[in-house]
């Protein structure tokens, strides 16, 4: 009887020990951001949205005039004489070329977890929706019909194999994103210098 009690106590102790170890192993890293720890404040949304500003093109140097009539190059441009060929792969349709759109949809799937001032939340949502529209405009300009995605896709998502949506469908969604941005973004004098504002969205929509 005494031996059975000892075995029972030992079993309980082991169970408790393994349970404690499991709790320790389930901790999130303290020196980096993790998804369950991130979506907690309006500032988190602003931080995420600010990451999209790198999509915008930088200042153009004098080389931007190479294909204009501003000056003549010493060597003829290859595209003038049709010396360039169309690639059989790549060219803006690879996995990485859709990364920004997925990042936008990743945000859209999570931002509602945050509680706070609705106008500030909508401001960050407006920035993200502007950049989703930005990405899709250039996809349509390059390829014509493209698949419209507004959900976060995984490696095994069936939507990865969907066909292209028509330009009309895609531009309907683009305009919805831009209209949301126009409605919820501030005027230039109401935000920090360099931040997205409603007039930039209006200009892009036009």
Stretches found by the model and what they are:
Residues 21-63:
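Membrane-proximal, proline-rich intrinsically disordered regions
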Residues 44-50, 54-58, 75-143, 159-172, ...:
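Conserved, well-structured interaction surfaces
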Residues 60-77, 147, 195-197:
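Short, solvent-exposed turn/loop segments enriched in Gly/Ser/Thr/Pro and often Arg
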Residues 145, 192-203:
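Aromatic-lined, polymer-binding surfaces characteristic
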Residues 28, 140-151:
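Short, well-structured active-site flanking segments
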Residues 31-34, 81-86, 151-158:
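Short linear capping/connector segments at secondary-structure termini
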Residues 129, 202-205:
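TPR/Sel1-like alpha-solenoid repeat signature
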Residues 1-29:
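Bacterial Sec-dependent N-terminal signal peptides
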